[in-house]
Amino acid sequence: MKHLAMIIFLITSLYSREANCTDMFGLIFNKNLSDAETAKYIKYCIDDLGCDANMTIEIPDLSIRSNLLEYAYDTNKTKTFDTLLAKGTAANASLATSIGMSFAFFFRENGVGIDNKEASPELLEFIKTQKYKEFKEEKFKLIKKLLEHGQDPKDYKVLKIILKIINEEKDLENLLKDGAKKELVQ
């Protein structure tokens, strides 16, 4: 079934470039496509159809413009994410906000959410666990990669607020400072 859908997609690409460029968002969210397949089709759209790697979708009710990189992050398609970075897709403030909010969601999923802008004793214990340390390390590696690709360190306001609540903002400040220094050296 997914091969039929891709054949239809490729055939229609011959007739309507604009329609297929916006289809890149649908490709990313397509659960029937593996990450590797999605990355391949995204690369095809950008390289062969001439689609803009920095295209966005305006969400009027939220007054934000989500881009392909944010969609790849939200669907956890890391190969697609890396392909988009390599094709020059800019990391925007909306993506940084999503990364920040993923910390809040992670805490809530583990039964230790932030309430009234304060960390509960359970949350302060949870951040000592290996599970949290691995999550944080994974997100910080991602942030470092985004900084290396030109993301503005100032975009991480939401994450700073969340980490300040659990007294871990210094780690982020150091990462953002080091990432900005590397960018200036280049």
Segments predicted by a language model, with ranges:
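Ankyrin-repeat boundary/"N-cap" motif
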Residues: A19-N30, N54-Y71, A91-K128, K154-K164
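Ankyrin repeat structural motif
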Residues: D35-I46, N76-L85, G113, S120, ...
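Classical Sec-dependent N-terminal signal peptides that target proteins to the secretory pathway
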Residues: M1-E18
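N-terminal segments that cap or nucleate solenoid repeat domains
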Residues: R17-D61, L175, K182
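Ankyrin-repeat C-terminal turn/loop position
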Residues: G50-C51, G88-T89, V112, Q151, ...
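Surface-exposed polar/charged interaction patches
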Residues: L27-K31, D48, T78, K87, ...
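Leucine-rich solenoid repeat scaffolds
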Residues: K144-E148, D152-V185
